[in-house]
UniProtKB/Swiss-Prot annotation:
With its partner (PsbE) binds heme. PSII binds additional chlorophylls, carotenoids and specific lipids. This is Cytochrome b559 subunit beta. The keyword Electron transport applies. PROSITE patterns: CYTOCHROME_B559 (PS00537). Heterodimer of an alpha subunit and a beta subunit. PSII is composed of 1 copy each of membrane proteins PsbA, PsbB, PsbC, PsbD, PsbE, PsbF, PsbH, PsbI, PsbJ, PsbK, PsbL, PsbM, PsbT, PsbX, PsbY, PsbZ, Psb30/Ycf12, at least 3 peripheral proteins of the oxygen-evolving complex and a large number of cofactors. It forms dimeric complexes. GO terms for biological process: photosynthetic electron transport chain. It is a single-pass membrane protein.
Length: 39
């Protein structure tokens, strides 16, 4: 029953981490692409 209580917390934490990580990786990728295009 402890797994039933910690699972939603892990899911919300996983969504929060990926919700922040995906735009960050995309933002860093676009910045590096712009620098390569300028050079």
């Amino acid at each position: 029953m402890t797994l039933d209580r910690t699972y939603p917390i892990f899911t919300v934490r996983w969504l929060a981490i990926h919700g922040l990580a995906v735009p960050t990786v995309f933002f860093l990728g676009s910045i590096s692409a712009m620098q390569f295009i300028q050079r």
